[in-house]
């Protein structure tokens, strides 16, 4: 029986190498970088004012002669024709003149207004460097700005833009087909509505994976073979992700159609797993119970084909008994502690609706409140 870690490696090894493409920065949100990016210059690029106020040549309280105004974007050397020698009005973000001891905010001045050159302004005592943003205080030149495999979040995109970067090399989003169904799927009295297709679609989008199309099964191996061939020829996916049809039942149609590895991973839920190919296209086979599908996609598909946040450790809010021989992935939410939500069974979809994380419970252990566990953001 495989461990979850071993199976994750096997899934990744079965997939083609991620292709690299160059995209405009404004189109790169949630994509994954393919190479490190370093800062080409420090940020801020120069000492600048944190406030609208006056640039002072010294920190002493007193009344100062007012000099020319320095606006954001002005070169102080051209405005002043030399170092600072008076109290000069300065705007937020403006480059600080040579010789500036501190910035005093306009609201601390008397009068509280920007005066014309030649007038006099009274200011309180200030501390050296007050309200001056120093060169490189956010990022030094050459520092790592974004690393390979980082997800391009809005803030990371803004940091790249602040360096004058307008395009990036990213891993091309993987394209998948989603295969769900079975003869039981439908809306009759004994039928089951398909929850797995929308679940997998939403999880794929969150992981930065494109859904190219869908395949529905009806427990007929010949029909599924035809559906696979037609959908793959039409959509040219990087992989197919199936849900259900791989366990030990009489109608395990996915397992009947595909050649590959089918076995068990020592985890609950999501024990049955499979890795196969169809006409040279990788097929990742997940179990069909909704929570098993959820857990399996998060652990094995999202990291291999897209992006998933790294797990981290937090203390448990309440004690729990682990299963004797299997690692367990319970659903829960995390604040300062990990809180388990709902029961352990793999059909309890509604009870998992508020979950934000998977909580990993080691096999054969009793964990008490306050002991740390590994959690996986969903």
Label every model-predicted segment.
Residues 47-49, 58, 77-83, 96-98, ...:
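Solvent-exposed alpha-helices and their adjacent loops that cap or buttress functional pockets
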Residues 2, 21-25, 30, 34-35, ...:
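Flexible glycine/proline-rich
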Residues 1-166:
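Phosphate-interaction motifs
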